[in-house]
């Protein structure tokens, strides 16, 4: 009977090298597959949100919900306006002043996961350029998505929001906000130049008023955002440039 021979050092090194090569080939494919799965989840999330938006509008004279624009979250009488994402609790500090269950879409959605991209770490500490390089967390840690402030003309006193019928079907209502800047998550709405995430292969998912949900590349987004005329991002009705009314 011949004794069993173990691996030689050279053979072991060859096996390790082969494993390393295979891992190098597989990891990018796995990362791409993970990203594709996250994009699919985002598309599904935003489609459900748009269904909830239209249900809300059907019950509210065709009006969009309050976008949770921070400067107008409190009404003139001091009460908090119910918004798409939350109703501000003035007795609590951030992030505890924001709660899903107080938002007007919650009764339709009823699932916190719908508000978040699987690849977005909402509690991560990041360097804020806007806040002078400080390491901070987001104030609002509920959602990866922001509503377009166009529904109130980007104004604190823009209540009530526009009617859906006043918007063009392909105007953009929701997008994935740029996660690299925590300050952009101080509320539930944004200006277009505050930007979109690039975590999906240099692009993000966006939703239009007609309920369609699409992928946009960063270069396409910023090209449209920089357009001085009314476009799908700057889309407040009744104005030439889609920005604030005069």
Model region roles, listed by residue range:
Residues 1-2, 240:
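Intrinsically disordered, low-complexity regions enriched in serine, threonine, proline
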Residues 2-44:
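Amphipathic alpha-helical segments typified by the pilin-like N-terminal helix
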Residues 40-246:
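Short, well-structured segments within or immediately adjacent to enzyme catalytic domains
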